[in-house]
């Protein structure tokens, strides 16, 4: 094993940073993880410390290599996958950030997005980026920093500052400040990148008043991004793959054929369908986004984004103290026959697709004298299925394919109740892979492609293995009754917000 090549995957997520060593046959050899704090300085604001993101990344990489010293010299390449949209601006000379990272969940630019929408710009933006006006994406976050942090706009105009999503920021530091680049999937989440022409869009830069001088170069997902600074790991290691977390998961789940769907359940939930090489704007207020680009050839996906998934279960643990470990939610949900007509709409940071209502907030409905904490826990897990169903019909219609099966991954898929309910409410089989670290796995595959460990994406398909399959068990009548209750709860929330 010592002489066999290995791949180091960096998975920088919203709430943790992981370093995972993969073998050349894509088996997990070692994992190190560190939790990452979120900060909430004002209502609707969500920030992180960029320097903590970098230091945590370095720490977990060192830890995984120090615990596997015999493999250090065998690391053939590094792949990076990351929380998307989170926005960082830093000084090109010092690498120091000029402001905390504004996280993808942050809603401070709500009003600006609504103003641009009211001015009629959204159809043009959607036609070029595949996205909608929402604080979720990077452009209004960049503009906010430029306009609200003293001296930043003038420094940006002088070329002193660099912008990047987390992948780009990590690449900059890993290469000792030598490389300012991103990949097509992360660039596509900024509202500034034209995914049809595959370049930064001058009209969009003007619309958001963002200077092109701060933007990184955009590359394929499998590319020679640069070499790590020798001081970090004792030698230079090629960085060969980068992709936003959901795109990396699509690759990790081997969704290489049009019509294949993966759904990731982490902090949020993100369902993507591979739609092939043709750009198709969504007709249902979903997102069209690059799945990946290799050798200059783009493959697109339709995406439905749900802002709160596993975060709702963490909230029940941390804020309401319903249980001590997230894993306990599974047994609690199974201890009662149903949720006793309770519906939990986890709109903590607004509703994502297909509603796109950043202004609404969460709701628990159907409470009665005999409601217990167990019913609320079960309702929170059921919400993951309901939210996914909200997406799937629209994804299938937009994508032009019927999904026969859904491959799921992320931390929440360890919850057997959630996976079974997902199969029941979607009326589709749900597959869980043996390796649920699909995001890191996708980054490893991309890095391996670059250094010729794999001839192409397809050959990695033979390494995908199913761990479990969940099939529907409830009647159509029960399925539709449950879903009608969910729709009524959401409409009640939307109506209350309008009033």
Swiss-Prot record:
CDD domains: FGGY_EcGK_like (cd07786). Gene3D superfamilies: 3.30.420.40. ADP binds at residues 14, 18, 267, 310, 411, 415. It catalyses: glycerol + ATP = sn-glycerol 3-phosphate + ADP + H(+). The keyword Cell membrane does not apply. The keyword ATP-binding applies. Pathway: Polyol metabolism; glycerol degradation via glycerol kinase pathway; sn-glycerol 3-phosphate from glycerol: step 1/1. It is an enzyme of class 2 (transferase). ATP binds at residues 14-16, 267, 310, 314, 411. It comes from the Bacteria. Transmembrane segments: none annotated. PROSITE patterns: FGGY_KINASES_1 (PS00933), FGGY_KINASES_2 (PS00445). NCBIfam families: glycerol_kin, PRK00047.1. Belongs to the FGGY kinase family. This is Glycerol kinase. It comes from Nitrosomonas eutropha (strain DSM 101675 / C91 / Nm57).
